[in-house]
């Protein structure tokens, strides 16, 4: 399935949550923190007031409660406004 975000929205594939702590303790699924980092998969065309700065392939940081979760063919994504992205890594 091909998803194309509209306007100033971006589609993000969240990075997998950490399985272990630095000390080697395995974290159960119920205790894992929601990832705050992910890869931009697709971007909208922007709005007349705001051009799109992000592009597919960018690794980004976003807020803990940013975006809307959706699942497509077994893969979980987030869709959010470009303004919800806090930083581009790398």
Curated annotation (Swiss-Prot):
SMART domains: Cpn10 (SM00883). InterPro entries: Chaperonin_GroES, Chaperonin_GroES_sf, GroES-like_sf. Gene3D superfamilies: GroES chaperonin. Keywords: Chaperone, Cytoplasm. GO terms for molecular function: ATP binding; metal ion binding; protein folding chaperone; protein-folding chaperone binding; unfolded protein binding. It comes from the Bacteria. GO terms for cellular component: cytoplasm. This is Co-chaperonin GroES. Heptamer of 7 subunits arranged in a ring. Interacts with the chaperonin GroEL. It holds the Pfam family Cpn10. It is found in: Cytoplasm. Together with the chaperonin GroEL, plays an essential role in assisting protein folding. The GroEL-GroES system forms a nano-cage that allows encapsulation of the non-native substrate proteins and provides a physical environment optimized to promote and accelerate protein folding. GroES binds to the apical surface of the GroEL ring, thereby capping the opening of the GroEL channel. Transmembrane segments: none annotated. Belongs to the GroES chaperonin family. One of its GO terms (biological process) is chaperone cofactor-dependent protein refolding.
């Amino acid at each position: 399935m091909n998803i194309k975000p509209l306007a100033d929205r971006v589609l993000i594939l969240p990075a997998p949550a950490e399985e272990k702590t630095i000390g080697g303790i395995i974290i159960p699924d119920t205790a894992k923190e929601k990832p705050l980092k992910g890869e931009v998969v697709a971007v909208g065309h922007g709005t007349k007031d705001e051009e799109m700065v992000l592009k597919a392939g960018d690794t980004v940081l976003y807020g803990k409660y940013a975006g809307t979760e959706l699942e497509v063919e077994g893969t979980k994504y987030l869709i959010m406004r470009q303004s919800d992205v806090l930083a581009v890594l790398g």
